[in-house]
Amino acid sequence: MVRPGLSAAAEERQRKLQEYLAAKGKLKCQNTKPYLKAKNNCPNPPHSKSTIGPKKDVTNHVALPVKTTRSINIKLQSRPANITRSQRPKLEPPKLGKRLTSESVSSNPNGKPPGNSQQLRGFGSSTDGKQPRKTMGSLNVQKLKTTKQQVTDQRTAKGTDPVDNTHVENESLGGCLKEMNKENLPQDLPNSERKPNPESWTINKPQTNQTKSSLASTREVLDKSSVNSAALKEGVIKPFVEETQISVPPGKSQKLSRVADLIRPGGKPPKTLPSHFVQTLNRTQATKKTVVKDIKSIKVNRSKYERPNEAKLQSYTVTEQKVKHSKPSTHPSVLQGGCNHRHPNIKQDHKPTQACCRPQTSYALQKSKAISQRPNLTVGSFNSVIPSTPSIRANGATGNKCNNSCQQRARTLDSKFKSAPPQKCFLNKTAPRTQAGGPTISGRGVPNGAQTNPCKKIAAEDRRKQLEEWRKSKGKIYKRPPMELKTKRKIIEEMNISFWKSMEKEEEEKKAQLELSNKINNTLTECLQLIERGVLSNEVFAILSSIPEAEKFAKFWICKAKLLASKGTFDVIGLYEEAIRNGATPIQELREVVLNILQDRNRTTEGMTSNSLVAETNITSIEELAKKTESGASCLSPKESEQMSVTPQITKSEQDGHPGIKLQIAPIPRINGMPEVQDMKLITPVRRSARIERAVSRYPEMLQEHDLVVASLNELLEVEETECFIFRKNEALPVTLGFPVSES
C-alpha cells in the first residue's frame, strides 16, 4: 500500500505547480493537471471532493461502465444512471441465479428510489455457484428491460424536474466488487470504476455539464462500438454495499434513454460516430471540470471464506477523470483476456472483458498506474476472474463457449503481458495524480518491493545451495586454500618479537657482565692492597681462587706474580705466557709489572753472575713473547679478542719517531736495454694501520698485501737477498727514513 506521505507530497507538488502557472499567467483553464490535456485542448471537469461513509448502510444498484479493449467478444456497455444512498438491496430465492442485477435509473426528482417495480434485486448465498447460465441470461434480459423502462419514465419527466434535483444513478464499481466478494473471486477493474471506501467517502453534486459530457461521451462510445454478448459470470454474487450520487439535468434524460436502448440484448449500435454527437461532446467538454475521487485501499482477504484460493476485495475506490477529446481508442495497458484466466503474473487490474464508455479516458491511465503498483497473483490463488461489472450483459452463449473463449483470451493476455511496454511510459505524460482528500492506495496491502525482495533472496540462497549440492555430487568440492599470507605474517611477527627479545637479552647480559666485571675488578684491587699490606699469601690465594673468571683480568696475574715474588724465585715468563693464553686484559699492566720484577736487583738467580745481564735477557724474552702473542691473538675468540687489550708492536721505526710507517718492497718494471736494473728492488715508505695488520690474516687472499712489507731495514736484509735497493719517495708520505733522496 502506498503510504500517506507520498500522496501528501504529490498534492503539495500539484499545488505549487498551479500557483506557479497562475503567477505566470499561463493557467488557461481550471485544470489542475495541465500535463493531462488532450490534443484538442479540451478543459477538464473539476474533481469532486469525497468523504468516507459507512459500508453497511448504502447499496449500489447501477454499475459504472467499464473501459474495454477492442476485443472480439466483449462490447461496450451503457453509462450509468443515478444512485441514491437510501436504496437497499433485497434478497431473492437462489433460483434467480444468485446474480446481482441491480441496475436502475431513478426518475424521482429528489433522488429517491423509484420503487420495487424499477429495481431488480437478486441476491443469494456467498458460497454457492451452481446456478445454470440460462437463468442468469434471463435475469440480464429482465434487468435491461427494467433499465429501459426507467429511462423512458425519466424521459417523460424531463420538462418538470429541476436541474439540481434530478439524480442519475452512477454505476460504480462497488456493485462489481460486492459481487466479486460474494463469489470470493478477484475482479479486475480500472481505478475509475472502483468502489469508494464506505466509511469515509461521499460524493458531492458536481456541475450539470459534467453529466452532460459524460452522457455524450457514453453515446459516442456506444455508437462507435458494437454491443455484443459479454462473458457469463460464474458463481454467486454478493449485494452492492456502496452508492454514489451524480446530479444530472433533466434535459439529458433523453440521451440516457438512448443509452438504455443501446444496451438491448439483440441491439447493435452503429460503429460510426454521428457528427452531431461529436459537436455536442465538444460543446459540453468546454465547460467540464475534473472529477477525481481519491483512490482508497484495496485489500484481499483470502482466509475469510471456505475456499482457500478465493479472495475478497474489502474496499475499493473510484476515480473519475476527464475525458480525453480524441479518437476513441483503448489504452495500451488494458489488455484483452477472458473471464477464467489463471496466469500467475496476471495482475488484478488487467481485466480483459471490461468495456469503456469513454474514448481514451483516464480510466485506463489510472488502471495502468494501479497495475504497476499491485503485487502479482500466484498460481492457484484464485479460481477464476469473472467480469462481474453490472454493466456487462450476459448473452445466450453456453458455458462451454464461455470457458473456451476465456481460456483463449488468457493465453493472449499472457503473450501481451510479455510483449507490452512498461507501464511508466504511459503514466509519465498522462497519468493523473490524486488530489487532496486522501492518500492514493492502489495495492493490495504491501508494495511489490516488500514482497519480491525476500523472495529473490530466498531464491538466490536456494540456487546457491543447489549449486553446492551439485558440486558435491560431481566431486567438485573446493578445498580450502593454504593460509600462506597469514603464516608469513605470523613468521614475520615472531621474527620481530624474537629479534627485539634477543636484543633485550643481549643488553641484559651486557649489563650483568659489566656489573660482574666491576665486582671482580674491585675484588682484585682489594687483593692487591692486601698484598701490599703484608697479608698472608694463603688467604689471598684462597680469595683469588674463589673469584669466577678471574683469569681474564690482568690484575689477577699481577696479584699472583707479586705473591710468587714475595715467596722467592719463580718463572715470570711462564706466568706472562699463561696470562696471554687466558686472554688477560689489559696486558700492558701485566707487562710493566713483569718488567719491574725482572729488574729488581735484590732478586737472586742461579747460574747468573750479574743482575744486569739477567735483566737484559728477560727484556728480550718478553719482547719476543709479545710478538708471539700478537700473532696468536688472531686465534682467540671474538669475545676474548675484544676483552684483551692489544699491545702495539715496538719497532725501530717507532723508536725513530715514525710510528706505523713501514717499507714496501716492489720489483722494478721491465725496461728494454737495461737488463742490470732487473735485479734491483724499489723501497717505498707506506703507512699501515695496526688494526688492519692484526686482522689481515683473516682476510681473503685478494685483500691481503700483494707486495712485501717490512718494518725495518734489518728485516729487509733478512727477507730479501737483493743487495741493491732504490728508494722511491712517497708523495703522500714525506718520510725519507735517512735515505738520500735526489731532487730530480
Swiss-Prot record:
Predominant location: cytoplasm
UniProt-annotated stretches for the region Disordered: 35-56, 76-169, 182-216, 317-337, 428-452
Residues joined by cross-link Glycyl lysine isopeptide (Lys-Gly) (interchain with G-Cter in SUMO1): 195
Localization, UniProt: Cytoplasm, Cytoskeleton, Spindle pole
Coiled coil: none
Modified residues (Phosphoserine): 744
InterPro entries for this protein: CKAP2-like, CKAP2_C
Compositionally biased region (Polar residues): 76-86, 102-129, 137-154, 199-216
Pfam family, one: CKAP2_C
Post-translational modification: Ubiquitinated by the anaphase promoting complex/cyclosome (APC/C).
Domain of life, source organism: Eukaryota
GO CC annotation terms, alphabetical: centrosome; cytosol; mitotic spindle; spindle pole
Keywords annotated in UniProt: Cytoplasm, Cytoskeleton, Isopeptide bond, Phosphoprotein, Ubl conjugation
Glycyl lysine isopeptide (Lys-Gly) (interchain with G-Cter in SUMO2) cross-link, renumbered residues: 195
Family statement: Belongs to the CKAP2 family.
Annotated function: Microtubule-associated protein required for mitotic spindle formation and cell-cycle progression in neural progenitor cells.
Record comment regarding domains: The KEN box is required for the association with the APC/C-Cdh1 complex, ubiquitination and degradation.
Name of this chain's protein: Cytoskeleton-associated protein 2-like
Name of the gene: CKAP2L
